[in-house]
């Protein structure tokens, strides 16, 4: 049974709210995927903070009209699942990682920072480390000289203690 007009308006409003806060939209064709696999994908998306949903393409076109994602409208053909996220790489990463293990999920397109991405662009976006990973790397780089300096001071103090004891 199809959606009535009120249901369609509610879906467009819900997707519009997600898109308003989003930095990235990733789109994939899901034809032939088992329900259990799709449920697993949804669970991974929830863990990553990605809004993942199968939607009617016409409703998505209405929701993304007059947004930075409007260029994606031409790519919305066929049975698609949409990943929408505030994190710049999360949606692309969730769909790309799942597509690596399941050949029935085919990445189609995406949009980031007002640019429409093809399949290769979505895969490239997915390969970028997340913000948390980048911050952890930066912290490690900043912490390394301090740690080295502390080890040097400790070794120097130990050497002086040995000289005094001798």
Swiss-Prot record:
Organism: Aromatoleum aromaticum (strain DSM 19018 / LMG 30748 / EbN1) (Azoarcus sp. (strain EbN1))
UniProt entry tagged with the keyword RNA-binding: yes
Keywords tagged on the record: Ribonucleoprotein, Ribosomal protein, RNA-binding, rRNA-binding
Family: Belongs to the universal ribosomal protein uL10 family.
Record keyword ATP-binding present: no
Gene3D superfamilies given in the database record: 3.30.70.1730, 6.10.250.290
GO biological process: translation
GO annotations of cellular component type: ribonucleoprotein complex; ribosome
Organism lineage string: Bacteria, Pseudomonadati, Pseudomonadota, Betaproteobacteria, Rhodocyclales
One protein family per Pfam: Ribosomal_L10
CDD domains: Ribosomal_L10
Function per UniProt: Forms part of the ribosomal stalk, playing a central role in the interaction of the ribosome with GTP-bound translation factors.
Annotated GO MF terms: large ribosomal subunit rRNA binding
Protein name, per record: Large ribosomal subunit protein uL10
InterPro entries to which the protein is assigned, alphabetical: Ribosomal_uL10, Ribosomal_uL10-like_sf, Ribosomal_uL10_bac, Ribosomal_uL10_bac_type
Subunit structure: Part of the ribosomal stalk of the 50S ribosomal subunit. The N-terminus interacts with L11 and the large rRNA to form the base of the stalk. The C-terminus forms an elongated spine to which L12 dimers bind in a sequential fashion forming a multimeric L10(L12)X complex.
Stretches that traverse the bilayer: none
